[in-house]
């Protein structure tokens, strides 16, 4: 099968099951696996939207303890004996009594060969409706606060009618608004400079449950939670809308006086720990989101990231490298502990930053990364980037249910040939051991089950595997390795759901089977490797991570390219490997690994989004797409991400996922400034200017978070966004264009010391064929 038809097949599997694998044939021995260089990995999107996924209204048929795999199309079923054999633990299980009428022709939907992904609506109800707790920073400019209040009031109409909603505001103090009290505005105030233990918060808010007192009957699972003391602060939207709208409308800027040489006093840490404490008492393991709207950095109390004096700048990457950071470690520890508590309770924290300065996302990143929350970085709450991204959080399906899931858990089962080594994505380990757990660790390892808390249809997880020590005893024809993904989550309709995806792939034949190399999916592999690189970058030095990326690439090319030893000119890669080196070239230069020119908050934000997206979106982040528009062609044409693509009469459209940029070549910019597009007879020029704008609008429609939209001209300051992404094939040192040589007129000269893709490939070939890694 040629590469294009294989790619098509992988695309169909991704549409059906939400899975892309780095290798689509599994090696049958550990020795063979160790020579693959790129680990066996799956990028899995559990809630991938697919209208035809069957939703079954009954409990799944599961294997006996401790296996608990779910009946699927790969199970052998003995219709006469009413038995099914589990492919994971090989035990025989009786079919339930209501399956007595099945025949080889009439089979239940979960055994149908096309239903490798299926969803069950479980009978277990959610302990309470979904909870939304808004935590709002009042130390903001008047216009920014007004825009935020407007967005929050509007969002109440997007919530399910039974959703519980609450409000905490903070500045110098943190205030919990008692919206259940209707006589007047009433709130509980916490000092911003003091650290409160969970128990103190609960006592001060009067939340200690009566059920905790001796002699009281304990709460029975499965029954709705009694609306105890917490109902003063969290009420169903339908009841609370009037009070909450009034409280939001009356929100004023923080009244604490501030001199011109000081920052506002902001107790973000106290506000968050009060929010976590409020949900922890009454709503443990009930789906809920704490949504933080930060207009600046925390400057007092636990979790402060910078001092209140303006002459003290907020930490940069350089400060962190030199360990010149006063608050960083303490703040990081504080927020990481808060994240652990939140994840343990099954709740999610979203952070919306609306500020030109940094707000401390670097320190707070664990809050989102451990709980499956969103992280949105914008310049202000007045920007459409914030407003539209915020609305998209509440997207709904055809039945008017929120697309987001709550309180989610992912479990992975494997057949005996495979073992799970870990997961990289927004989740925490549940420390569950099973026969599927491997010896080595990649990402969050030593477990086969993870808690994600918040999950949405785009959320994707990198799951990594190894081949078991013994491997298959002896190779039999058509032997397959299998993986089953079980995702339990609270659906916004109020029931728990279980999404089951089961995949099977061939095991390779005797050593040196070419099927393994043919099964390499370079796009999935690039994304899975970039997740490992970013995971490493969080703990290792930048240069060490780049060296690791290079080393792995050289080893992969040495292993799978065709060449004669020590002859770089003989180097050839198969079609399904050719793009991989350039993905790695762009990954090395990307903002995920090169932190120069980005603030620590931006780096945390970019890495957060990369760890959330699927293969195609992640590839756009790693290697942006570039389209060119000119007079003698219809629409945009994809062009190389290269400085030679900049031409005076062309318009370029760059999509980096985070930015969408329209760049006008020198001549086009001059014509536009002269106003030709408004003159008669120049309609084709006017439509040329419009085309990239229309395409940009299409790109923005379903993108989350909303990208920044930039229109710039050749030589303009904003053009740096484009130049930094291009392969510098024409630099001030490359001759072409340096001294008016050939090509000086057309291509843009880029002033950089970065190597070009061509030089990078030459070095790669030389090292790969020399056999020294």
UniProtKB/Swiss-Prot annotation:
Disulfide bonds: none annotated. InterPro entries: ADF-H/Gelsolin-like_dom_sf, Gelsolin-like_dom, Gelsolin-like_dom_sf, Sec23, Sec23/24_helical_dom, Sec23/24_helical_dom_sf, Sec23/24_trunk_dom, Sec23_24_beta_S. It holds the Pfam family Sec23_trunk. It comes from the Eukaryota. One of its GO terms (cellular component) is endoplasmic reticulum membrane. Keywords: Cytoplasm, Cytoplasmic vesicle, Endoplasmic reticulum, ER-Golgi transport, Golgi apparatus, Membrane, Metal-binding, Protein transport, Transport, Zinc. SUPFAM superfamilies: beta-sandwich domain of Sec23/24, C-terminal, gelsolin-like domain of Sec23/24, Helical domain of Sec23/24, vWA-like, Zn-finger domain of Sec23/24. Zn(2+) binds at residues 63, 67, 86, 89. CDD domains: Sec23-like, Sec23_C. It is found in: Cytoplasm; Cytoplasmic vesicle, COPII-coated vesicle membrane; Endoplasmic reticulum membrane; Golgi apparatus membrane. It is a peripheral membrane protein. GO terms for molecular function: GTPase activator activity; zinc ion binding. Coiled coil: none annotated. One of its GO terms (biological process) is COPII-coated vesicle cargo loading. Component of the coat protein complex II (COPII) which promotes the formation of transport vesicles from the endoplasmic reticulum (ER). The coat has two main functions, the physical deformation of the endoplasmic reticulum membrane into vesicles and the selection of cargo molecules. Belongs to the SEC23/SEC24 family. SEC23 subfamily. The COPII coat is composed of at least 5 proteins: the SEC23/24 complex, the SEC13/31 complex, and the protein SAR1. This is Protein transport protein SEC23. It comes from Chaetomium globosum (strain ATCC 6205 / CBS 148.51 / DSM 1962 / NBRC 6347 / NRRL 1970). The gene is SEC23.
